[in-house]
Design a protein with these regions (language model features):
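Conserved pre-catalytic core of RNA-dependent polymerases
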Residues: 28, 35-36, 40-160
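Basic/polar low-complexity segments
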Residues: 1-52
């Protein structure tokens, strides 16, 4: 493993300016693109949403890496595997958040971003890559949703 030392990292203002130039500007897609018309003409069933089941929570935690870096919640997957009594409460709260997303607690989507130096001049912002540690609860909720979308896509959208 090559260790790259950041002797003089860029300032917070330089970092924010750089990333806003890449991600901060809204862009418009071509609404008349041919692929959009083709997709609109396809007869695809809609994905019906069913409440998250406790079995999905338990299954997710059983496959999660025990000591992955947690976000602001500081919850390690190990404890969620070891304390199955929490799964019922997590299930209830996830379903409440899906029903009323505006009531989701701010900490759920908060992350800690670390700027990892790649190579080159450590003063240059472009020579860093951001790594964001999201909360364990956020990763769990989005992981369950992603699995459902993947299953739906495999069963309903992809050709047989």
């Amino acid at each position: 493993m090559k260790i790259i030392e950041a002797r003089e990292p860029p300032t917070m203002a330089e970092t924010e300016t750089y990333w806003k130039s890449l991600w901060g500007e809204e862009s418009q897609h071509n609404e008349r693109a041919e692929w959009i018309r083709r997709e609109q003409e396809r007869k695809v069933s809609h994905m019906c949403w069913m409440p998250i089941q406790i079995t999905e929570i338990t299954s997710y935690f059983s496959k999660a890496h025990n000591w992955k870096s947690p976000g602001n919640d500081q919850i390690q997957n190990y404890w969620l595997q070891a304390l199955p009594a929490t799964h019922r409460h997590i299930t209830k709260n996830f379903n409440a958040i899906i029903e009323e997303p505006e009531k989701a607690p701010d900490w759920l989507t908060a992350g800690i971003t670390y700027m990892i130096p790649k190579s080159g001049d450590s003063k240059e912002v472009r020579n860093y890559r951001p790594i964001t540690c999201l909360t364990t609860m956020h990763k769990t909720l989005t992981g369950i949703i992603a699995k459902r979308i993947h299953t739906f896509g495999r069963q309903s959208l992809l050709p047989a």
